[in-house]
Amino acid sequence: MSLLTEVETYVLSIIPSGPLKAEIAQRLEDVFAGKNTDLEALMEWLKTRPILSPLTKGILGFVFTLTVPSERGLQRRRFVQNALNGNGDPNNMDKAVKLYRKLKREITFHGAKEISLSYSAGALASCMGLIYNRMGAVTTEVAFGLVCATCEQIADSQHRSHRQMVTTTNPLIRHENRMVLASTTAKAMEQMAGSSEQAAEAMEVASQARQMVQAMRTIGTHPSSSAGLKNDLLENLQAYQKRMGVQMQRFK
């Protein structure tokens, strides 16, 4: 795996699924391929994106700044600086300075990532802030190692939280989660339908599922009643995809 592919993989792992993720993936590909060279416009676009957390925007802004060639005097952006200040915690800043001194002696991507993984996400973000604000300089490879370690720390905590939700025994949370999954599966079916022959059938199944979820939310139902809805919908989607020759993997 090339360095830029690895960076793209780690950065995208912390962005919630949806149309915005696809859009960001495209921007990253363009930036890494040297097709997008207007850093100012790129940062303005990033600043106004909804859904993304300030830290995610800060990390993306850092990656864009590292990759897109720009004039030396180009102003640093406040939204990136604020996101990469380690929540203003002096403890994070102290650790960031210690980490920076170690990274300064490092020259490889993997070496930098390895060193960085023993620090908290707050300290890692602060260290990125030091480099972003030109208070310290490291090689681009080392900076990317720092980025990937930060994303890994964030993705780990997101995964733990997701796993807790999936394995929860609280019937109300499980019920709501099944209904949300049914809604997103319905949306996926509608998007895939396009102009194929089976489009009408897919749209019909998706529409029924949406109405069912709406009704369940409006009148309230027993928490176990949504299990069948989600399973039926996934079976319908699988059958539809088989006919279309599309792999199911993407929706598991």
UniProtKB/Swiss-Prot annotation:
It is found in: Virion membrane; Host nucleus. Residues 165-252 are annotated as: RNP-binding. InterPro entries: Flu_matrix_M1, Flu_matrix_M1_C, Flu_matrix_M1_N, Flu_matrix_M1_N_sub1, Flu_matrix_M1_N_sub2, INFV_M1. It is a peripheral membrane protein. GO terms for molecular function: RNA binding; structural constituent of virion. Its main location: virion. It comes from the Viruses. One of its GO terms (biological process) is viral budding from plasma membrane. Residues 1-164 are annotated as: Membrane-binding. One of its GO terms (cellular component) is membrane. Plays critical roles in virus replication, from virus entry and uncoating to assembly and budding of the virus particle. M1 binding to ribonucleocapsids (RNPs) in nucleus seems to inhibit viral transcription. Interaction of viral NEP with M1-RNP is thought to promote nuclear export of the complex, which is targeted to the virion assembly site at the apical plasma membrane in polarized epithelial cells. Interactions with NA and HA may bring M1, a non-raft-associated protein, into lipid rafts. Forms a continuous shell on the inner side of the lipid bilayer in virion, where it binds the RNP. Homodimer and homomultimer. Interacts with NEP. Binds ribonucleocapsid by both interacting with genomic RNA and NP protein. May interact with HA and NA. Cannot bind NP without genomic RNA. This is Matrix protein 1. It comes from Influenza A virus (strain A/Henry/1936 H1N1). The gene is M.
